[in-house]
Amino acid sequence: MGAASGSIGVLNAPTNLLTRLIHHRYRLRFQVERPAQGFFTSLLCCSGPFAVYRRSLLAGLWPRYLTQTFAGVRCTNGDDLHLTNLILATGRQVLFEPRAVASTWVPRTLRLYLRQQLRWNRSFYRELRWTFAGIRSRHPYLALDVLARALLPLLLAAALVLLASEGLLVGWELLAADLTLAVAMLCLTAAFLLAHGASVSFLLLYGPLHMGLLVPVRVWALLTLADPCWETR
């Protein structure tokens, strides 16, 4: 075992609607997404607020960790993801322990939240070369997980364009069939999330928030990877 991380809760969840939405997003992340990665003993990111590392491994990784550069610029943030990638590259297990629980404060304003998401997404895209290097000999599910998250903005944009073009070029009957299938998939997803503790407000509001704000933030992060402005607060 090279490193491990646990579940993280939200201390200020009751503050407002945004913090409650983030709280439910955290529940989905630490009850569904992280356990799936942990099942293959290859957690893709040991969260900064709550992680442990094998000390004997760190001694050999510090030089690479402290001198990391991207596009000729020294990297000063995104440290939890890069350190996890370096551990994965050693071939050691990186475990997820759901029974170990910590709590953190999350952004309480939309401005702070979007700045946080911009920083996280820049880190995610910048780290892709190290992420794939760390998981190349591991279970294929991990590569699919990373690819799905990396391509999500393009896939969502392409889906919207295809739906619109189908209605104009092929006929509204085919578009209606596609929308029916999409609604059915959304219903199945909603049932799954509700079974895992998500609220109705999360299901109704997080989708528009993701499409309207977080997808553009992810695209902007991809276009501005070399921007050294990383501070969240």
Language-model features: where?
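Residue-level recognition of hydrophobic positions within alpha-helical transmembrane segments
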Residues: 21, 50, 75-76, 113, ...
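Cytosolic juxtamembrane C-terminal amphipathic helix followed by a basic/polar low-complexity tail immediately after
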Residues: 231-233
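Loop-to-transmembrane boundary segments
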Residues: 3, 136-151
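Non-transmembrane catalytic domains and loops of membrane-associated enzymes and transporters
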Residues: 1-135
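Membrane-embedded multi-pass helical conduit in multi-pass membrane proteins
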Residues: 148-229
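Alpha-helix initiation/capping motif
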Residues: 54, 138-139, 199
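Short juxtamembrane and helix-loop transition motifs at transmembrane-helix boundaries
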Residues: 110, 132-143, 166-171
